[in-house]
Design a protein with these regions (language model features):
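Nucleic-acid endonuclease domains
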Residues: 1-37, 42-203
Length: 203
């Protein structure tokens, strides 16, 4: 279990600190190269992993992460609770908050996976690389170099650079929430319907 704390330590975490305080969450300590959710929600003996995101009220979109690959999406799929909050610059939350669960996030994940696999009008996807790789294999291209290229395309080359989540997606698919008590009631109700009674069952 992560060590609870109610304060993140960098200035960039100012909005997350407000979310953590508002909803009575336990923050994860610091940041590292390995992905970890932002906080934990404790509710009647159960612990839920929480990802915190904010959206500039003027821009109406949410930043996610750099270098999003299939691996990152699979990590996101394990997150049990997503909380989204709007803010006005510099860092004042407006009071508009939504909670989303895995099934509400799944269409977004699938959209990202489709872009990684198929590409877009301007950028290649893994399907394009696999087509090119087949042609290189057919002409006897050096296997060592080919393996390096394959690794690069699968782990970096076709990654998405900070794909945004539209605020409209959050508002349409999420449940509005205004307090720590209300959040816990929504989470408890959702996971009770799913037949989950504790954190381990939800993973």
């Amino acid at each position: 279990m992560p060590k609870p704390t109610t304060l993140r330590t960098t200035q960039d975490d100012a909005r997350e600190n407000q979310q953590i305080a508002k909803f009575g969450l336990a923050a994860r300590e610091g940041r590292s190269n390995k992905y970890t959710p932002d906080a934990d929600l404790l509710c009647e003996g159960a612990q839920y992993e929480v990802e915190l995101k904010t959206s500039d009220v003027a821009k109406k979109q949410i930043s996610t992460a750099r270098g999003v690959t299939f691996k990152k999406i699979e990590e996101w799929r394990k997150v049990q609770v997503w909380i989204f909050s709007q803010y006005e610059r510099p860092n004042r939350l407006t009071g508009e908050n939504y909670v989303l669960f895995p099934e509400q996030m799944e269409p977004y994940y699938k959209k990202l996976e489709d872009k990684i696999q198929k590409g877009t009008k301007k950028r290649a996807g893994l399907d394009d690389w696999n087509y090119a790789k087949s042609a290189l294999v057919a002409i006897g291209f050096d296997n060592t170099v080919l393996n390096k290229l394959d690794y690069a395309f699968n782990h970096k080359g076709c990654a998405l650079n900070d794909p945004k989540i539209p605020w409209s997606y959050v508002a349409t698919n999420g449940t509005r929430v205004s307090s720590a008590a209300e959040l816990r009631e929504i989470v408890k109700r959702y996971y009770s319907r799913q037949g989950f009674t504790n954190r381990e069952q939800c993973l």
